[in-house]
């Protein structure tokens, strides 16, 4: 599976950080809403929902979900 530095090489993606049951994705300006749209349309049970601005996405995660599961899922949304 793809790690964060691999995803960073993809167009639009800059970083991913976790705090409790929240994840924050930073993107280049203008990319956040399209990435959030792709995340939301996968109906992934461990991500309750997203809120996107111009260059930031907040993901609300299911309680106690393993960060590795989220990173793995995101590697399919944000491929190399």
What are these regions (language model features)?
Residues 2-71:
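Non-DNA-binding regulatory cores of transcription-related proteins
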Residues 70-80:
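Short, charged, intrinsically disordered terminal tails
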